[in-house]
């Protein structure tokens, strides 16, 4: 594990634990998600995954040499994440959401903020 990643894990541990014990997540794990909620989750996820590489590229381009390790981390993950939007599209197809609906879907303000301000 790289030092950068190890430090990232330590620094985000409290937030990760809060997420893992959030009542909505615990309820979904215990009882599952209604199909419509799962479709919405996938539609939101599609937009996050679709924008991951452009957002990462923009972030990497702004990093100076003092943050080379972060830049290389972003490059590596851009490569690893390429094409994952197709995985989400396949899941959307499997639950009856046509491609046209995915393209026309307006993501929530939360998703737009995540994609637009990172």
Feature locations, PLM:
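Residue-level recognition of alpha-helical structural elements
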Residues: 1, 34, 67-70
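Active-site-proximal alpha-helical scaffolds that flank and shape metal-associated catalytic sites
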Residues: 69-118
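Alpha-helical transmembrane segments of integral membrane proteins, especially early/N-terminal helices
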Residues: 1-11
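Serine-centered coil/turn micro-motif
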Residues: 2, 22-23
């Amino acid at each position: 594990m790289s030092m950068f990643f190890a430090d990232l894990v330590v620094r985000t541990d409290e937030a990760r634990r809060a997420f893992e014990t959030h009542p909505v997540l615990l309820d979904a794990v215990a009882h599952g998600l209604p199909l419509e909620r799962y479709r919405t989750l996938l539609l939101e996820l599609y937009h996050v995954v679709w924008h991951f590489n452009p957002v990462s590229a923009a972030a990497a381009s702004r990093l100076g040499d003092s943050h080379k390790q972060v830049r290389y981390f972003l490059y590596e993950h851009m490569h690893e994440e390429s094409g994952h939007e197709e995985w989400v599209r396949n899941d959307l197809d499997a639950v009856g959401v046509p491609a046209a609906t995915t393209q026309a879907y307006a993501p929530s303000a939360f998703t737009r903020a995540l994609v637009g301000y990172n």
